[in-house]
Structures are given as structure tokens and as C-alpha cells.
Amino acid sequence: MSLITTLARLEAVESGRARPTATVRHRRLTDRPLVLVPLTTAGEAGAPLGALVGTDREAPRLLAVAQPRDRDLRFAFLAELAEAVLPHIESYADVVEPAERGETDPATGKRVKVETELCVDAAQIVVPSRAGVEFVRLLGRSMRFRRTAEDDPDTPYPAPARVPLLGRWLTHYGERARVPGSSLLLACTDLLNRHWATGQSSLEDQHLGALLAWIDPPAGESGAEAALRAELARDASGQLLCPPAGPATDPDFDNRLLAPAIEKYDRARASLAAAEDGLAADARLAELTGAEREIRALLAGVLRPTWDAVWRGLDLLRELPEGARAEDRWTRDRWSFTAHRDRVRSGEPPQPRRDDAVTAARKLAARETAQAQLEAQEALDDPLVLAGRRLAGEAFIGEVSAVEMAYSESKRPSPRPLVTVRTDERPQLGEGVKVYRSLDGKPQTAQFAGYGPADGDGGAPSLVLRITDRMGRGKEPAPGSVPEPGDRIAWTLFEHDQRGGPQLPDAEETPWTHGGPPGGLEAAELPDPVTPEDLL
């Protein structure tokens, strides 16, 4: 936690209202996000109970499983979910624009530009909390390997046709959510926590109702009071006025309302199966339909407050202007979306259960690079975030007091002007340390050359920086490429554009300890044989 965030939390406690930790919105919000509010069954890991899904805040689609332990009803739920989600995703897949990307020419080994297409936009999914993101990933893992009747006519429990496809998409979204700065799959609580600091703990910030109470409390009530009421207040029947954001449910709801309703449904279904004539069957069918409606009404009552809270959170976030570099991160999301669309359409198999060593290393390297890029871009977009880096000595703002032209000592001298900067801050500088500033949206590098004279009695010494790049190819610097006296500039000690690490070897050159050469991975996946020592 940065010092700025700590101060913001202290101010929130004192004022009774959440304090902003950002002046711009650092994540892209599309015009039509798909909001998904899921519920799971207590005691059944990953068993869906119900969901509200849709892009229209006034008309959500309710999906419910009357008996979560019934495999057929769970498959019916997944089929309904596919009908609700896949058309939204596919509506973005065919709207494309021409684009170029770099690829390695197999003949020459050089990087070349290749004409391709890029989806103009991508489908965005928003869930209430971080647990919802994990549930989406779990759903994808459980669905993408399902066999349909078309795949295998002899499979004992065939899945509906579109369920495996939805599983592949949800798996992709779940994996993409692990990339720092990605906006394909967002948790509302994480979004709000990124832009506001409350006076409660990070664990309490995962309660969507309490979080919104701190950010936008009712008139005449402090955030702490509103948050406490959101967490604990119950109605006359003992149910929470602000139900959990899911996917877990409140135990009192399970015990007092849901369990009796499911038992009633089970009895009605058993009675229908035992009916001996048509009249009795019609009566039992009416009872079964009524029991199912009761369960749907209970789930709707629990889900709707969370649904409204998610949209309220999105409204608060839309009041912030979008950060300048959020578009760049969204473009990478669009490339990811387009690439997965191409893999699905080309008939590639589903994502494997476990990544091989090379794929895992590439993912980790990409996420590390994305994390560094995100931290740098947020600081460049947001003065409040930059202030936190300045307090940590990782950036500083100073005024240029003098510029002295100098040149390198190479055979072809290049301009290396010395810029003297006055600042009251204490950046962590050492001899030869590189600093960076943004010049026309791209980084310009300078080296710390030493300290200059102090400004007045007892003042901090000035900093002397040597500009090293982005001044053109001429003997004299290009106009505007060198700061002028009086310019007030933000310098950072961190790079603005992170470079990737070294390339990993091909599969044929990968050591056997990491899955190669070809065929080694399959051998490594075989379990050890069971021996008598393994049995007690």
C-alpha cells in the first residue's frame, strides 16, 4: 500500500466518506458491458444456483436451477447461460477493421509486417466481486471439455451443443483477467477499490454494498454507519437487506428460505412421477410449476440488489474521465479477443487443463511486463498516482533552470545537452541512473550527471541531467526535443515502455526438465505406478 493510499484511508476514517485515489478512470468501460451476477450452491463446489445476466439494467435475464444437484437441470442452466452470453460475444466477432501486426518470417527469421484484421471492439463482462471472476474461470474449466451428443453419441451425459463453446470463451476471459490492466473481465469491487480508498479493511472492501456505502453514502449518514448497516441490517424475516454479492449465499437465506423451497420442489417432482392418471398428473404439474416459481422468486430477490449495485458502481466510475493510456491497454484486449476468435473458428482444441512449461513461462513473463506497464502508465496518466511514486523517490517534478549544450565524444559527435533542474524533492538518484520524461507521448531518456549548486542558503542542490535520445539525427537537436529554462517537467526513474525478456527456446531445444524434446511432455504427465507402500 502506497503512502498516498494510506493517507487517503486515514482521511476517509476522519471524514466518514471514501477518498479518491485516482483522478481518472484507469480501466476501459464499454458502452454495453454484459453484467453477470452468479450464485452458487452451498456445499457444492462450483454448482450453479442462479444468475442475473444481461446488458440492459432494467431487464436482466434470470437463470435458475431449482435443484442444483440434478445434473440435467444444471446442464439446462448452462445452456441458458450460453444462449444469453454467446450472442453478445459473437456480435463483436464479425465487426473488424484492417490492421498490421509483426510476425517472424520463417524463411528469413526477420520480423515483418503482416496484413490482418482486428475486431473494432470486444465484449466486456462485469461481475460483482473478485469471487465472481474465480467462478467464471471455474465455470469455463468445467464446461470446455464437455462432450456433446454430436461429439460422442455414446456419452452418458451429453452437454448441450453450445456449452463447450461458452466454456472456451469463459476460460479465455478468466485467463485474461489475470493480466494486469486487462478490461475484458472486470470485478466491480476491484474497480471501485482502485479509484477510491475507504476507512475499512481490504477484506471488508470486498463487500460491494459496504464499499458503495463508503463512496456514496445516503444523505445525513456517514460511510461507516451506512457500511455497517449494509453488512448487518436484516428485515423482519431475518434476511439481509443487502445480500452478499455472491457467488456465495447467506446461510440464513439457505436455511430459512431456500432449503424449504427446494424440499417442496423435490416433493412436487416425486408426486408428479408417482401420478397414476392424467388429472392427478396435471395437478402435480401445477404444484411443481408453483414450487419452481417460488425458487425463482427467492433467487430474484437475492440477486436484484446486487445487480442494481453493480450498475450503480459503473455509474460512479463513468463520472471519471478515462485515462489517456487506457485505450492502449484496451487495444491489447481487442487483439486477445480477436486471436481467441480465430482459434475457435479454425477448429483448434480447447485450452489444456495445464499449461506446459514454455507456455507457463511466457504467460508469467507477459504478466510481469503488463504489470510494469500498467504501473508506469497509471502514473503518467494520473497526477495523484504520480504523487505516490514521488513520495517513494521513484519520480520527481522540477523546473529547468539552465540548459548547456554538450556533445558525445564519438567519431560522429551527437548532441548530449546538460539540463539543470531545480526541485525540492529527494529522488533516489545515483551516478549514471537513467530518468525518463514523456515527449510527444513517447519516453525521452536522460542520465543523472551529478548535483549542481544549491538554490539559496540551505536549499536543496539542483540536479544535472544529460539528455541522450530523441533529438533527431542532425548535429543540432530537433526543435522542441530539449527542455527550455522555465519548463516544469515530471521525470520518472522507471521506464515508460517495458521491454520483454529474452526469447524462449523452440520446443525441440527445450530441456527435458521443462517438457521437451517432443514427446517428453506426455511421458512426464504419466503418474507414478501404485506400489504396496502407497497403501496403508
Task: Tell me the role of every PLM-derived stretch.
Residues 1-122, 135, 141-181, 185-188, ...:
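Long, charged/polar, low-complexity intrinsically disordered N-terminal extensions
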Residues 7-10, 285-429:
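Accessory interdomain/linker segments of ATP-dependent helicases and helicase-like nucleic-acid enzymes
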Residues 37-42, 67, 127-130, 424, ...:
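Structural motif
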Residues 42-49, 58-62, 132-137, 426-431, ...:
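Short, surface-exposed beta-strand/loop "edge" segments at domain boundaries and coil↔beta transitions
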Residues 50-104, 184, 191, 195-196, ...:
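A broadly tuned "polar low-complexity/structure-edge" signature
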Residues 114-128, 133-138, 142-346, 436, ...:
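Alpha-helical structural signal
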Residues 384-482:
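Conserved nucleotide-binding/hydrolysis modules and their immediate coupling elements
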Residues 436-440, 444-536:
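C-terminal effector modules of nucleic-acid-centric enzymes and ribosome-associated factors
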